[in-house]
């Protein structure tokens, strides 16, 4: 039976700005909705669009474009200091309030989205029911050191080409871009050619890299922005909701990168997708969605109004 999606889009006012969002499914279904936080920082919802499949289970799915990206307000003239973790935490809380789901929701954060989701979950918000960090760092220094290790395993000459242009600051040189793409094809998305929604996200980052450059850097693995010293290690034990860690066998988020989630969070489980890198939701879409739905059904199975009554 084909699932006919109920979809609505809108904008949440965030101060003087607008946050675009999309709801797939019914927020009044009684089942905990899932908020999907995209990566970057500076990407868009497009490449994580596949998580809309979860709505067929009865859990409504909310996608949104973070400020500065996609269909939300762009601010290319803002100083890099404007773009902070705190800003994006405020935007997330504002969206939860706008959708009137702040008393009952789950979060799935992919890559940077899982970093932001971790910061949110560490604060123990009363309505958070479950947390899914997908392919996410816990320490940017570990992330970079693991990326450097993976780079050295790429075909001969790729790592050396990357080093040469990073030293020179020539990040737009076609040679650097081609070498970067080799890393991406091994450790970011192994589907060839890239699905249209993945290519669309990268095209939008290229069109306005304001947030990506300010907080991360020119590539996934050369982190020189404001997040370069970020870490959640030592704070993750504050996360007090059931947690599902997702990663891929070929992921730039290596087992060493995600290990602190498993070490520090009390109620945690790990799904490792053998044929995926950084995007199991694209590379093993059906299996990934099934894993997410099974987890949500297990940990959010009791209707929220029953919990409240108890």
From Swiss-Prot:
Residues 33-284 form the AB hydrolase-1 domain. GO terms for molecular function: peptidase activity. Signal peptide: none annotated. Its EC number is 3.5.1.101. GO terms for biological process: proteolysis. Completely inhibited by ZnSO(4), ZnCl(2), AgNO(3), CdCl(2) and HgCl(2). Partially inhibited by PbCl(2), NiCl(2) and CoCl(2). Unaffected by LiBr, H(2)BO(3), NaCl, MgSO(4), AlCl(3), KCl, CaCl(2), CrCl(3), MnCl(2), FeSO(4), Fe(NH(4))(2)(SO(4))(2), CuSO(4), RbCl, Na(2)MoO(4), (NH(4))(6)Mo(7)O(24), SnCl(2), CsCl and BaCl(2). Completely inhibited by phenylhydrazine, but not by the other carbonyl reagents hydroxylamine, hydrazine, D,L-penicillamine and D-cycloserine. Unaffected by the chelating agents o-phenanthroline, 8-hydroxyquinoline, enthylenediaminetetraacetic acid and alpha,alpha'-dipyridyl. InterPro entries: AB_hydrolase_1, AB_hydrolase_fold, AB_hydrolase_sf, Peptidase_S33, Pro_imino_pep. SUPFAM superfamilies: alpha/beta-Hydrolases. It catalyses: (S)-piperazine-2-carboxamide + H2O = (S)-piperazine-2-carboxylate + NH4(+); L-prolinamide + H2O = L-proline + NH4(+). Keywords: Hydrolase. GO terms for cellular component: membrane. The active site is at 111 (nucleophile), 251, 278 (proton donor). The keyword Nucleus does not apply. Hydrolyzes L-prolinamide, L-proline-p-nitroanilide, L-alaninamide, L-methioninamide, piperidine-2-carboxamide and piperazine-2-carboxamide. Has a much lower activity towards piperazine-2-tert-butylcarboxamide. Does not hydrolyze dipeptides and D-prolinamide. NCBIfam families: pro_imino_pep_2. Monomer. Belongs to the peptidase S33 family. This is L-amino acid amidase. The lineage of its organism: Bacteria, Pseudomonadati, Pseudomonadota, Gammaproteobacteria, Pseudomonadales.
């Amino acid at each position: 039976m084909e699932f006919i999606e109920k979809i609505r889009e809108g904008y949440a006012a965030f101060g003087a700005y607008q946050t675009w969002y999309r709801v797939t499914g019914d927020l009044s279904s009684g089942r905990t909705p899932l908020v999907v936080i995209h990566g970057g920082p500076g990407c868009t919802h497009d490449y994580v669009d596949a998580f809309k499949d979860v709505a067929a289970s009865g859990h409504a799915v909310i996608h949104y474009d973070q400020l500065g990206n996609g269909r939300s307000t762009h601010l290319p003239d803002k100083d890099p200091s404007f773009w902070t973790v705190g800003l994006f935490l405020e935007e997330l809380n504002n969206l939860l309030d706008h959708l009137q789901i702040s008393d009952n929701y789950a979060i799935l954060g992919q890559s940077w989205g899982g970093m932001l989701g971790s910061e949110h979950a560490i604060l123990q918000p009363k309505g958070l029911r479950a947390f899914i960090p997908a392919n996410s760092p816990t320490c940017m220094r570990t992330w970079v050191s693991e990326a450097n290790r993976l780079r050295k395993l790429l075909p001969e000459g790729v790592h050396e080409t990357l080093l040469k242009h990073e030293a020179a600051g020539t990040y737009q040189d076609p040679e650097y871009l081609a070498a970067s793409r080799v890393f991406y094809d091994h450790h970011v998305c192994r589907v060839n050619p890239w699905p249209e929604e993945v290519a669309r996200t990268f095209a939008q980052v290229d069109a306005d890299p304001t947030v990506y450059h300010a907080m991360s850097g020119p590539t996934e693995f050369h982190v020189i922005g404001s997040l370069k010293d970020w870490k959640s290690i030592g704070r993750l034990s504050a996360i007090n909701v059931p947690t599902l860690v997702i990663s891929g066998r070929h992921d730039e988020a290596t087992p060493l990168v995600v290990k602190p989630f498993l070490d520090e969070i009390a109620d945690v489980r790990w799904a490792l997708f053998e044929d995926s890198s950084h995007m199991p939701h694209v590379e093993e879409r059906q299996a990934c969605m099934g894993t997410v739905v099974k987890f949500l059904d297990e940990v959010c199975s009791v209707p929220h109004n029953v919990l409240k009554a108890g």
